[in-house]
Amino acid sequence: MRLDFWLLDLNHEAHEGKSAIWLWGVTHDNKRVLVIDANFQAYFYLLPKRGQDIDRLKEKIEREKPHPSIERVVIEKKKRLAKEREVLKIFSREPDSLEKSARECVKQLGVEASFEDKLRYSIKYQIEFEIRPCQWYSAEGTESSVDPRKYHVDKVFEISGHPTAIPRENAPKLRLLSFSIVAISPTGSPSPIRDPVRLVAWKNSDGHSSTVQSEKNSDEEIIDGLSKIHQKFDPDVVFSFGGNTFDWPYLIKRANLTKTKLSVGRDDGPARQSLYGHFSLTGRANVDLLDFSGDLYDVKIKTVENVAKFLGVEASNPAIDETEYYAHWTGNDRSALVGQMKAQAASVFNVGEDALDYTLQLSNLSALPPDQVLAAAVGFRVDSYLMMEAHKLGELIPAREELNIVPYKGAIVLEPSVGLHDRVAVLDFSAMYPSLMVKYNISPDTLVDSAGEDVFEVPEVGHHFRKNPPGLYKIVLSQLIASRQAAKREAAKTPRGTREHKILKAREKATKVITNATYGYAGWAGSRWYSREVAESAAALGRDTINKSIDLAKSLGLKVLYGDTDSLFVEYNEKLVSQFIKEIDKNLGLEINLGQLYTRILFTEAKKKYAGLMDDGELDVVGMEAIRGDWSNLARNVQNEVLRLVLEDANPTRAKSYVTNLIKDLESAKVPKPSLVIWKTLTKRPDEYEVNAPHVEVARKMAKEGWSVSVGDKVGFIITKKPGKLYQKAEPHFKVSMEQVDYDYYVNNQIVPAAARVLEVFGIAEKDLVGTSGQVSL
């Protein structure tokens, strides 16, 4: 019997006494299925030393069995950095014993190394048969005697071979669920040891939303209610925002303490912590959108509301601060808190729905399941992709080792032409570093010791790379670049707003992420194919390319105002820009495209800091405090408005007037308190700091009062009129009234510096805004 299904998730389980892979999928008629493949035997490789007799090694292993799990041995030809070698392929009846078995073999046989013994059984299965999540497959098999109701599926199949990919583009209609929990404490942050969950708000893709609440000082009803939501609606994808760091750990601890079963997986099991710190729900994809926000570099303060605003999806702003939850829950205004949490669950759902296509495309490309791919650092995404591709090329997959990295010179950044400039175009090289690695065959397996007839020498650093045959990086990057270009072409031909267009744009973005990250992967400490020479050579070629491009632009009469890594900012002249693009292709063999066009742009003296006004009137701010997370909203708003005014007017008059008027409003307490809050992130536990910084002191105060503050938390504080040093004047934002605010501090240390960083380009310094008494000149 043939079965076609779309793969959502997979895991390693025992089935009838054998190791098996369980594949969770959806059929073309929207049925949920569990496909069991018990036909894969785990193995690892042994690489003999030069001169060792491989046949004798094989006989010895078969005779002496260095580890009892070894079942059989075969000799194969594989590649080690493109060089063909004979290896021993050792099959084991116990997947969990691979590493021990390999260690004993290396010890007893004295071979050079073992390979692929540290890879998980499920990952080896994916690599062996090229199984990627979020793709359609076909398999032959029979219906299993396993009761499908036990696993919340419509049918269970046992297959005779292995799944094979079939060309089918779109994912099936998935069932989506979002949720958010509330736990409250009368003193500080809630603790799962002490404080029960009082409320769960949820929304699903059928359009239903509600809450589960508990009046008791216990949360058995809440945990049981959340379990029933998962069992009844049976979601494929579960969205949260911070679920991996807060919701799931809290729920699991509460379930254990109350001895209440948390049944959220398709196996009716709990959430289980897995790779990359994420929590796995068997047969479902647990997608934490806080991880997704990590890919949105322009969103500095990671809240679901900020992410929703960036994506342009609907979200409500919370009116009730977390510090006020207890008062609302125990007082007469509980309904407002319940309403806010329902709105938050809806916001999480909207963000998740918008992010889903990108998540599925990134999962398919990297081969990491949807619940892992966002939690994984970009290096691990590339790692997973490269393992799959290396196996197809017959390469042995080396173990990942943490290395001591030797720093190397990075990308070139030009000195900006300070001041205002009209009609400025940004010219972006398309995948410049990957393209250079392809062009010059830069790869760990093409690196050679000396120059030769068929060898390329990298300028400046002097490393040598073989021109032929293509290396690992050239092969995989060529495929990625071609795939991205194909998605881009198809998207251009597809009507905007259609489902197909959105999927193609998501595929293009996912491919771009993996392509650009591959260059950095070469110099990443956790890389399986680490090579400082590769990373250093790619950076050197990038610098050489930018310098040649600048010379070419100047020869055409095109004025270059700034350059950063793989982009040039030029005075826009349509004819000259068009000619320049053609000359780059002709002379350098690279693609450069017209990117952003600014009506007017302001460059400061610092590199990587500028702001531009676009044709639609939108302000684009890069590298300045306006988009950083360590100033108050007041300072960011001041700088944004000053930038907007000087860019609109091409002079500082109106901007300076705006600053003086704002200072009057501040001194009259006419600004909202939230705009005065300064947020800083803890990089250590509060007790580990040796300095007395304001956010550290506030964190210590909060900890003493029962609030949970730890590494990675953002601490919000306001500077008050209290005497003492700055750190002594800082108080938690929720404990400060407007009468306690030190307005002089905000004038002299927030408004004036934020404005002066822009206005100093026009010769207006802080001293021109501040009088001799230390107060601002009005």
Describe the function of each predicted region.
Residues 210-213, 234, 238, 248-251, ...:
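Active-site-proximal helix-loop-helix substrate-binding element of RNase H-like nuclease domains
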Residues 571-732:
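C-terminal polymerase-core module
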